Amino acid sequence: MFIDSEYSSFLIINVTFFAVKLLQFGLVWLAPRTFDTSTHLFLEHYGITSNPWWGKLLSWDSIFFLKTSLWMRNSGYSAPQYEHEWAFSPIWSIIIQSSDLQHIVLKAVSFNLLLHYLSTWIVYALTKLTFPPFGQNVQTKLALTTSVLFILSSAAGFLISVYSEPIAFTFSLLGMLFRQWSISFDVYGNLHMDKLKWISYLLSSFCFAFAFLNRSNCLLLGLFYVHDCLNLFKQKKWITSIFYPILSGTILFGVFVYFHYYFPYAALCPERGEWCNSKIYGLPIPYQSLYSYIQSKHWNVGFLKYWTPNNIPNFLFGLPNIVITWNAITYFSYQYPSRNMKPYIWIARIFLFIMVFLANVQIINRVSSFLPLSLWYISDSLIKNPHEMRIVKYYVMWLLIWIPTQTALFACFLPPA
């Protein structure tokens, strides 16, 4: 029975994944040429004029990853050419480097398909490890439903392009899996670390750090270590806290300081001025990270800056994920409280606050994929209360409409970005 259940999961996940991707690429192929000519001008500069396929996969920010990758390969530099390009994962641009532009696109799209597929199975394993086996079939069904929902991501068209979301959420989820495998809770809610799995716990920090290098919101994953540290402090396990969460958190924080402060300062300053001049006590570290500075200056990111009448459509685009994330937080805080869920809830609360009050709110549809809390809420609701959870049903219906719609809009270079 168990083997049959696992085989069914394998079959359903594979069929769903490849069916969704075929549908998306079919929509891209059928989409009309984009009204925006900036991508075509960029491609023509590199001698690609005959195939409109490339232009359809390179909408919105995709072009920045390509341009930086080409710049690094041709110039020999390990940093972007212009200040605003630092906001688009230089690490991902290095990874997708190739001999020419067409090969870069092919490499990036292939990597993203592979990463999305692999991360689907990571979600499957993480779900089975996180939730107690009340019954093998129930646990497997929860993992299967979560994995299918992960395939049906609201990121849609962004996941078949050159964006860095897939590599970010793959390593985010892998880090969660490593951490979850290393810990356990007793009936009193006390955290216990398996000393034989110390390397696994430490590996989670490297995964989170690499995810952060590709998507800055993954810095919030450091809250896992804050949670673990506080729990161990309560038990007065000082040595364990030092060698587990404190060491792991220090690695993540060190990567943050180096790549968002010191490295860009060394590359841009003192010639840049402005950002370079706001140093902390004369150290080569400005008060504000370069990423925050770029977001504020070039994309008008800041508290309530996005709360303007012309951005109402963008709030509507992001509303389904805002509502489902809020419901997931409430569900796991009160209706299904679990020690395992506590750090996920912390991360989701801060993430939701940032998305609604500080960021360009519509990007929640693609960047929320780094955290599986909402997927677990939907899956658990569909299994336990299939006839009562109206909001969950509406969200799933919205996904089924949104994925093909957004993919087609993306291929035509139309909002939302």
Swiss-Prot record:
Bilayer topology: Multi-pass membrane protein
UniProt lineage: Eukaryota, Fungi, Dikarya, Ascomycota, Saccharomycotina
GO cellular component: endoplasmic reticulum membrane; mannosyltransferase complex
Domain of life of the organism encoding this protein: Eukaryota
A Pfam short name: Mannosyl_trans2
Residue ranges of the TM segments: 10-30, 104-124, 142-162, 167-187, 206-226, 239-259, 312-332, 344-364, 394-414
Entry's EC annotation: 2.4.1.-
Claim: NAD is one of the keywords in the record: no
Cellular localization per UniProt: Endoplasmic reticulum membrane
Annotated pathway: Glycolipid biosynthesis; glycosylphosphatidylinositol-anchor biosynthesis
Main location (coarse class): endoplasmic reticulum
Coiled coil: none
Name of the protein in question: GPI mannosyltransferase 2
GO biological process, one term: GPI anchor biosynthetic process
